[in-house]
UniProtKB/Swiss-Prot annotation:
GO terms for molecular function: structural constituent of ribosome. GO terms for cellular component: cytosolic large ribosomal subunit. GO terms for biological process: translation. It comes from Caulobacter vibrioides (strain ATCC 19089 / CIP 103742 / CB 15) (Caulobacter crescentus). The keyword Metal-binding does not apply. HAMAP family: Ribosomal_bL19. Keywords: Ribonucleoprotein, Ribosomal protein. It holds the Pfam family Ribosomal_L19. This is Large ribosomal subunit protein bL19. This protein is located at the 30S-50S ribosomal subunit interface and may play a role in the structure and function of the aminoacyl-tRNA binding site. Residues 112-131 are annotated as: Disordered.
Length: 131
């Protein structure tokens, strides 16, 4: 009984947070730009982190996604909680075609072998229009 109450509270909290912010529909393989609030001393600024979404995990309040980018020739991955207050916005720059839910194999690839084909319809296409 107590577990059901906790699950219900988490579901309500998740619905409340999702209604408060616009989170686009994205999947692994999509190129994202995540605008993150960074606090430096007294100042707060927004930093853009752009890369390929290689994984989504969890559900509800605990949902997270991993973004991988190459910075100065070195692979950098960052895990973001989806409903984190430090995320200002998420933009889908490019939609990719992949057949896997987790793209961890990209860690071992460089250059052309790490490319992901673009899904027809571009970033504005919704999941309902694709067949």
């Amino acid at each position: 009984m107590a577990i059901n109450i906790i699950a219900q509270l988490e579901q309500e909290e998740s619905a409340r947070l999702l209604a408060a912010r616009a989170i686009p529909d994205f999947r692994p393989g999509d190129t994202l730009r995540v605008n993150v609030k960074i606090k430096e001393g007294e100042r707060e600024r927004v930093q853009a982190y752009e890369g390929v979404c290689i994984a989504r995990a969890g559900t509800g309040v605990h949902e997270s996604f991993t973004v991988r980018k190459i910075s100065f020739g070195e692979g950098v991955e960052r895990l973001f909680p989806l409903l984190s207050p430090s995320i200002e916005s998420i933009e889908v720059k490019r939609r990719g075609v992949v057949r896997r839910a987790k793209l961890y194999y990209l860690r071992d690839r460089r250059g052309k072998s790490a490319r992901i084909a673009e899904r027809a319809g571009g970033p504005k296409a919704s999941a309902s229009t694709e067949a």
